[in-house]
Swiss-Prot record:
PANTHER family: ACYL-COA THIOESTER HYDROLASE YBHC-RELATED, PECTINESTERASE 53-RELATED
InterPro entries: Pectin_lyas_fold, Pectin_lyase_fold/virulence, Pectinesterase_Asp_AS, Pectinesterase_cat
Catalytic reactions on record: [(1->4)-alpha-D-galacturonosyl methyl ester](n) + n H2O = [(1->4)-alpha-D-galacturonosyl](n) + n methanol + n H(+)
Species for this entry: Aspergillus niger (strain ATCC MYA-4892 / CBS 513.88 / FGSC A1513)
Keyword set, alphabetical order: Aspartyl esterase, Cell wall biogenesis/degradation, Glycoprotein, Hydrolase, Secreted, Signal
Pathway stated in the Swiss-Prot or TrEMBL entry: Glycan metabolism; pectin degradation; 2-dehydro-3-deoxy-D-gluconate from pectin: step 1/5
The name this protein goes by in its record: Probable pectinesterase A
EC number, UniProt record: 3.1.1.11
Signal peptide stretch: 1-19
Any Pfam family hit: Pectinesterase
Length: 327
């Protein structure tokens, strides 16, 4: 079920249907009508649900795009299109998640669904997928693992999106992934998995006590990182969590995470990191952070580092070919 509505015809973007880096998207612009060539979803669109639009793409391998008009879409989606696909949400400001008016929501726990992947509101298994200005939530809440989005593909890009849940919100399962100007909210292990991921200029928001990250890197040959760069780490509005949140814990034995150039609020426990997998020797780093939670003098399980890591280290030599640099 959904309740879409259009805000009105304002200045629109003229764009081609591409799933590769969307260089035409500029900060502080609106997107209130469909880019050229996109399938349309909403009360005035060709399709009433996002799932119907995905089905309409069929078995084509051409680049494609879908524009979703304002509304709440109660759907559970699998993104398995064979070509590059971009999903655009309506917004008055493409540079931020804060003005998003499109939400995809579903409520189920992993125990009820049968697996983490099956609990996901959106399950991405298509390489080269990009999403702009869409909120994704799993409304299950406390008591069980319940995924909002699982990224299980390579070269995934999320721009101005919001991911909300409680435990296991964002399952970065595999591949390389890029999150820019997004918000990720949860309480327990709400960024987890084995992907190599860059989070840039994001708000990472705890709505309960627990650990933020749970990397499942487990071999020294695994090149994966979680790089949290120029982000704000804070409590959800109205929630008091002073020293109740850890930067991470190792889901697998060689977890590797860095927080760099970020603002760590007073929610961060002075120990910084905590335990999970038996026998773990994680690689946990902090570099050039600020804020009440950035004092590292009492940190545990942490390794020193002399410089920030870069996108090439995290995403590989070709990162500039597939991320949207305008973000």
């Amino acid at each position: 079920m959904h309740t879409p509505y259009l805000l009105g015809a304002l200045a629109a973007l003229a764009a081609t249907a591409v799933g590769a880096p969307a260089e035409h998207i500029k900060k502080r612009e609106s997107r209130t009508s469909a880019p050229s060539g996109c399938l349309t979803v909403g009360s005035d669109g060709t399709y009433s649900t996002i799932g119907d639009a995905l089905d309409a793409l069929g078995s084509s391998t051409s680049s494609a795009c879908i524009y979703v008009a304002s509304g709440t879409y109660e759907e559970q989606l699998t993104i398995d299109y064979a070509g590059n696909l971009t999903l655009y949400g309506e917004t008055t400001d493409t540079s931020t998640y804060k003005d998003n008016v499109v939400t995809i929501t579903h409520t189920i726990s992993s125990s009820d669904a049968g697996s983490l992947d099956k609990s996901a509101t959106v399950n991405v298994v298509s390489d080269g997928f990009s999403m702009y200005n869409i909120n994704v939530e799993n409304g299950y809440g406390e008591g069980a693992q319940a995924v909002a989005l699982v990224g299980n593909a390579d070269q995934l890009g999320f721009y101005g999106c919001q991911f909300s849940g409680y435990q296991d919100t964002l399952y970065v399962k595999a591949g390389t992934q890029y999150y820019s100007n997004c918000m990720i909210e949860g309480a327990v292990d709400y960024i987890f998995g084995d992907a190599s991921v860059w989070f840039g200029e994001c708000d990472i928001v705890s709505n309960g006590a627990g650990a933020i990250t749970a990397s499942s890197r487990e071999t020294s040959s695994d090149s994966g990182w979680y790089a949290i760069d120029n982000c704000n780490i804070k409590a959800a509005s109205g929630v008091s969590l002073t020293e109740e949140v850890y930067l991470g814990r190792p889901w697998r034995v060689l977890a590797r995470v860095i927080y760099q150039n970020s603002v760590l609020s007073d929610i961060i426990n002075p120990k910084g990191w905590t335990t999970m997998a038996d026998g773990a020797t994680p690689l946990y780093y902090e570099y050039n952070n600020s804020g009440a939670g950035s004092d590292t003098s009492d940190r545990e399980y942490e390794t020193s580092i002399s410089a920030a890591v870069d996108k090439t280290t995290v995403l590989g030599e070709t990162w500039g070919d597939w991320i949207d640099r305008s973000y």
